[in-house]
């Protein structure tokens, strides 16, 4: 899906480039590239050790554990054995899922870790009380349909779309929407359609007890009367031609690509319509609503519960995958709780063996000036190199001052094409 979006954007930019005489661009990768990469994938079940290397210098094994973030998400355990040493396990948490979410199981713990690399996305906050998803969504649907409008929901194709279908099935089954009982629901995203099929095919391994109970009673948690899936561009464009109040679920969830932009174009100007975000509101004429609490990430309490489930404390916890301040906050919190922990900088090198941990290289740090204070932030070596190239480009521009207008125009067009390619 990402490759398809890149191909579409390249096609659109190249049409503009042909009119202006600018240099043509190529997508970073194509659908064919993605399909070729998929041939290299090897499916692995949860909780099964897979041998990655076995030779005279040692043995490395890998195991996936369901971490409850998305369908198929996993933490990764690496068991490393070297001659003359006790085998040790390093665990990479990945994104740790939220608990008590619809459809998929709660996150599991790998059981043992000598060294842990742990995410910290929400390491400084709690999600608060669980919202009434069904009640909140029902209220949005009822008020919008009563005004004759559509409910447009920008949604991630994997995970979020399926959760919404799960809620809407229950809303319809309980007859919560009065006067619009047969309201249609359109899922307008080829990737969301494929993802929903994968959810249905893997219910035995991935569904939680509540969703499994529905399946065992003969009900599909993701199917209900009035559900329509749009595959073709023509089917997508026809959705807004029908005046019937409806739900439109479409990707991308951030509204920066995909078919959702078409639906926003046709509904944002209509005050009777509602755009339902699981994110930040936008000031437009259509009513903007927010359905809170639908987070795939564990909060501070969830991270702590997952960490405490190990059979014994890891010898060291490396904190990553969070905003700088949050990662530092979570690492300090772990230290207060008696863990050996650190939030390393990008590019840092650590040596861990037989329970001993040492930092060999600190990594990349730099100071940035904010309005009130200076703060140390992490920056990658790749970004530093990119910034240096930007300075070099300015020097080259200055060196070309006084050059032929034709050459300067060509140079400017090349820079504009490069900016258009990466400014997205």
Locations of the language-model features?
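His/Asp/Glu-rich metal-coordinating catalytic cores
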Residues: 1-163, 169-184, 206-209
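Short, surface-exposed amphipathic charged segments that create phosphate/polyanion-binding patches used
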Residues: 60-64, 198-206, 304-306, 354-365
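Active-site metal-binding loops of divalent metal-dependent hydrolases
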Residues: 70, 94-96, 120-121, 156-158, ...
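A general structural motif
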Residues: 96, 129-134, 225-235, 253-256, ...
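Hard-cation-handling environments
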Residues: 140-279, 311, 326-328, 332-337, ...
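Charged, amphipathic alpha-helical linkers/stalks
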Residues: 143, 347-410
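C-terminal, active-site-flanking charged/polar segments
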Residues: 271, 322-367
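Generic long, charged, amphipathic alpha-helical segments
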Residues: 281-307
